């Protein structure tokens, strides 16, 4: 006997969260809970404004239609990426095919005063990997901050993300202020320039490895080994079903590329599932999941060690 619930939710964000030049005041999304006999599976559907093609209203319509079909015996997963991801997670939990083991290590997202960051990063236990957003300020300033961090902490490796913010000139201005002796400790720089060709040229000219992120979701993207390309960053909420995520990870690994499972600012429920996916598909790589602190609450499932208050399922708006 099948049953299902769909919940709508909204979490207040910390002040200062800006995506693609727009302030994100709340994170809006949906949960689906599927039950069959004694088993239960949850999934999160939370399109990311400015990045997802669909809105959460679009996703809600598709999800509710899918749930009614599933209750009638149809299991075909929808095409809409955020719905496909959430539904496939719920089905995987229901079938007990999503392993419970999770990788809760996170590459901390660094912002704020560089001196404070140096103290925080120096005290990090184990492998020191951190992420810095670049491209929000002047490229010269970004280069100076990155250089300062790498100089101060000799065993630090940085993941940088420019979100295609730079022209080739801006990219060169950034690189000019990063000591060539430190550049090998930039694990990768995600999408430095507005076009893939300019990003490839940046990697060749600077010796700084790059990673593809937005490119993975473009229709003409193909997985090929390229000089200067070291990694791909996979955001399942923007990608689609678990099967599609696994296919992309396998394609990257076949080329010797690092695959990083990364957050699209999901709630704690979605983040804990991403931690499980990372442990399953990319066990040797620290995932990019350090986004919970951007929110003011957790929901349904806790992220281990987080002090944020937990909102129980009973407090959510039920749609079905």
From Swiss-Prot:
Keyword Metal-binding set for record: yes
GO biological process, one term: menaquinone biosynthetic process
InterPro entries found in the cross-reference section: Enolase-like_C_sf (IPR036849), Enolase-like_N (IPR029017), Enolase_C-like (IPR029065), Mandelate_racemase_C (IPR013342), OSB_synthase_MenC1 (IPR010196), OSBS_N (IPR041338)
Pathway listed: Quinol/quinone metabolism; 1,4-dihydroxy-2-naphthoate biosynthesis; 1,4-dihydroxy-2-naphthoate from chorismate: step 4/7; Quinol/quinone metabolism; menaquinone biosynthesis
Residues at which Mg(2+) binds: 161, 190, 213
EC number: 4.2.1.113
Enzyme type, top EC level: lyase
Molecular functions per Gene Ontology: magnesium ion binding; O-succinylbenzoate synthase activity
Catalytic site: 133 (proton donor), 235 (proton acceptor)
Keywords for this protein: Lyase, Magnesium, Menaquinone biosynthesis, Metal-binding
Cofactor(s) annotated in UniProt: a divalent metal cation
SUPFAM superfamilies reported in the protein's UniProt record: Enolase C-terminal domain-like, Enolase N-terminal domain-like
SMART domains: MR_MLE
Catalytic activity, reaction form: (1R,6R)-6-hydroxy-2-succinyl-cyclohexa-2,4-diene-1-carboxylate = 2-succinylbenzoate + H2O
Family according to the record: Belongs to the mandelate racemase/muconate lactonizing enzyme family. MenC type 1 subfamily.
PANTHER family per UniProt: O-SUCCINYLBENZOATE SYNTHASE, O-SUCCINYLBENZOATE SYNTHASE-RELATED
Free-text function comment from the UniProt entry: Converts 2-succinyl-6-hydroxy-2,4-cyclohexadiene-1-carboxylate (SHCHC) to 2-succinylbenzoate (OSB).
HAMAP family for the chain: MenC_1
Protein name as it appears in the record: o-succinylbenzoate synthase
Biological source species: Escherichia coli O1:K1 / APEC
């Amino acid at each position: 006997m099948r049953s299902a619930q769909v919940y709508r939710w909204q979490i207040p964000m910390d002040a200062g969260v800006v995506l693609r030049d727009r302030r994100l005041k709340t994170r809006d999304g949906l949960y689906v809970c599927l039950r069959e006999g004694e088993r239960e599976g949850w999934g999160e559907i939370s399109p990311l404004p400015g990045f997802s093609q669909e809105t959460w209203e679009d996703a809600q319509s598709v999800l509710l239609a899918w749930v009614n079909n599933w209750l009638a015996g149809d299991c075909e997963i929808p095409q809409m990426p955020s719905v496909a991801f959430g539904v496939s997670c719920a089905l995987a939990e229901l079938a007990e095919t999503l392993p419970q083991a999770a990788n809760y290590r996170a590459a901390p997202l660094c912002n704020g005063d560089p001196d404070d960051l140096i103290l925080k990063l120096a005290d990090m236990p184990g492998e020191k990997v951190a992420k810095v957003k670049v491209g929000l300020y002047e490229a010269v300033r970004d280069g100076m901050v990155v250089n300062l961090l790498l100089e101060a902490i000799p065993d630090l490796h940085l993941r940088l993300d420019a979100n295609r913010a730079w022209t080739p000139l801006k990219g060169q201005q950034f690189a000019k202020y990063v000591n060539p002796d430190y550049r090998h400790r930039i694990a990768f720089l995600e999408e430095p320039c507005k076009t893939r060709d300019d990003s490839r040229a940046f990697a060749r000219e600077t010796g700084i490895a790059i990673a593809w992120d937005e490119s993975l979701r473009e229709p003409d993207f193909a997985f090929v080994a390229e000089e200067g390309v070291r990694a791909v960053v996979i955001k399942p909420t923007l990608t689609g079903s678990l099967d599609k995520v696994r296919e992309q990870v396998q394609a990257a690994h076949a080329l010797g590329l690092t695959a990083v499972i990364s957050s699209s600012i999901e709630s704690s429920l979605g983040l804990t599932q991403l931690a499980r996916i990372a442990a399953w598909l990319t066990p040797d790589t620290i995932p990019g999941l350090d986004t919970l602190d951007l929110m003011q609450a957790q929901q349904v499932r806790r992220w281990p060690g987080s002090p944020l208050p937990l909102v129980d399922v009973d407090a959510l708006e039920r749609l079905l």
